[in-house]
Curated annotation (Swiss-Prot):
<dbReference type="GO" id="GO:0008239">
    <property type="term" value="F:dipeptidyl-peptidase activity"/>
</dbReference>
<feature type="active site" description="Charge relay system">
    <location>
        <position position="322"/>
    </location>
</feature>
<feature type="active site" description="Charge relay system">
    <location>
        <position position="350"/>
    </location>
</feature>
<dbReference type="Pfam" id="PF02129">
    <property type="entry name" value="Peptidase_S15"/>
</dbReference>
<feature type="active site" description="Acyl-ester intermediate">
    <location>
        <position position="156"/>
    </location>
</feature>
<dbReference type="InterPro" id="IPR005674">
    <property type="entry name" value="CocE/Ser_esterase"/>
</dbReference>
<comment type="similarity">
    <text>Belongs to the CocE/NonD hydrolase family.</text>
</comment>
<dbReference type="Pfam" id="PF08530">
    <property type="entry name" value="PepX_C"/>
</dbReference>
<dbReference type="InterPro" id="IPR008979">
    <property type="entry name" value="Galactose-bd-like_sf"/>
</dbReference>
<protein>
    <recommendedName>
        <fullName>Putative serine esterase Rv1835c</fullName>
        <ecNumber>3.1.1.-</ecNumber>
    </recommendedName>
</protein>
<keyword id="KW-0378">Hydrolase</keyword>
<dbReference type="InterPro" id="IPR029058">
    <property type="entry name" value="AB_hydrolase_fold"/>
</dbReference>
<dbReference type="InterPro" id="IPR050585">
    <property type="entry name" value="Xaa-Pro_dipeptidyl-ppase/CocE"/>
</dbReference>
<dbReference type="InterPro" id="IPR000383">
    <property type="entry name" value="Xaa-Pro-like_dom"/>
</dbReference>
<dbReference type="InterPro" id="IPR013736">
    <property type="entry name" value="Xaa-Pro_dipept_C"/>
</dbReference>
<dbReference type="GO" id="GO:0005886">
    <property type="term" value="C:plasma membrane"/>
</dbReference>
<dbReference type="GO" id="GO:0052689">
    <property type="term" value="F:carboxylic ester hydrolase activity"/>
</dbReference>
Amino acid sequence: MTRRGGSDAAWYSAPDQRSAYPRYRGMRYSSCYVTMRDGVRIAIDLYLPAGLTSAARLPAILHQTRYYRSLQLRWPLRMLLGGKPLQHIAADKRRRRRFVASGYAWVDVDVRGSGASFGARVCEWSSDEIRDGAEIVDWIVRQPWCNGTVAALGNSYDGTSAELLLVNQHPAVRVIAPCFSLFDVYTDIAFPGGIHAAWFTDTWGRYNEALDRNALHEVVGWWAKLPVTGMQPVQEDRDRSLRDGAIAAHRGNYDVHQIAGSLTFRDDVSASDPYRGQPDARLEPIGTPIESGSINLISPHNYWRDVQASGAAIYSYSGWFDGGYAHAAIKRFLTVSTPGSHLILGPWNHTGGWRVDPLRGLSRPDFDHDGELLRFIDHHVKGADTGIGSEPPVHYFTMVENRWKSADTWPPPATTQSYYLSADRQLRPDAPDCDSGADEYVVDQTAGTGERSRWRSQVGIGGHVCYPDRKAQDAKLLTYTSAPLDHPLEVTGHVVVTLFITSTSSDGTFFVYLEDVDPRGRVAYITEGQLRAIHRRLSDGPPPYRQVVPYRTFASGDAWPLVPGEIARLTFDLLPTSYLFQPGHRIRIAIAGADASHFAILPGCAPTVRVYRSRMHASRIDLPVIQP
């Protein structure tokens, strides 16, 4: 399955698009409002194949977005598109065109409280927003062109909307593809390792607030005001008065960064939690949530039993540099075991627009994302023989080896190979035999992973991910490096680190980076993990969803502050990866006490940390190694 030139092209020779439906050329556009049960009007764009006969019946793709379903060009520019809207997200535009040409209707939706839709947003993915999805499906299946079958998909927020649509258990929805999207809001994006991802909640919150005011130029640049008026009004709204009314309704939208900043633990309840507000403003819960706490009530993991009961097949789709979402895709795949579900993990950034190679940098992917989604959805919706039904359910890409591999589950069978922190900043395969040994590190609170990291990729519709030579940053960190390898070493799965530490503080943030040092001394980033020390307690209790890494609750009742000077054990996982270390290269772990580029710095002065490496307190990293 290796491709020449290091390509990430698919494991099959070419997309097999055999379909029970004919192919079409061109699209027919219309838009309208659909009124929900509470009177809120939701804006919808509909795309049908051009030349569709009145007798034809098609399945539909439902795509619900928080980032505008489309834009309106100013006069006379809009005449260049024949009055049709401007499709501002290139990946969605290509996907829409591909699916419509393949015999699907495509429905774009501005979710409640966003775009040209009315209503206010009291939280993301509210129970009202989820219920809207079922009513929109009802509207779709009533249309004369619909055959009664609906699939849902999307990247990022839109992918989560597709997943939560299944909470309704609507019989028309047979398959979804949540791509590059979260599963557990707390650990996947808002608080990885229990540390507030402050850059994300602040930046994403400000961008959304600007979009909700129809101020696109504040997100993409001042020039955006020149060609567009903003979000696309529906066709009946010729004077844009309805759009203006929707924008006015958005003034009541909530502030995600403010709420996130008020939380520490998974079970914290925000003062502005919409599920516990005044009776006349309180949201009615939906589904059968398994955990309490403000952040859990907007998280897909909390409703996995409802999603499972839908019976819909799910394609969990992500990339190794997609923020924390590769692990999200894994957790979803392992937890929601509906028949026909698949998992794919490629060498991509958020939304898959770039292929990331730790040794060679960025390139455009050869992988046909839209063709792969068509293979999956055609199989489940049209019963087409696309080949996917006979394949193993898991495919993953091993970087450096540049090879797609398959498995029946995740992680693939591996042997744990431990490397121990040792004297002289060495990383050794043999456990220490000394009675004492430690290294002292004064936390450098300026340390960070830069402006083109995996965490920045989550904002800006899939930004570039490129980690430059880490040598300069590593000078700020505590590093341990192995001897040069004498053979290739494939690491696939979840790396786990165990640190024995003392600190001058009662809390702290710990970041561990797995790196590759080449023979010239260049340092390449592979993956990372983090943990806030107050969350260090491991739990033997049943987790809320299936786990294959050390489990902790992140609940307030399990808080465990450090005692200055007392040795504490920190065990946590790094984000999953599949990477081949080459002969002559060295393995490095780098330990930091801050990532100022992305995560909140705890109040107080920079602590001094001691990392122990003795017989009794053997700090180590456990690598899941695939034997050749």
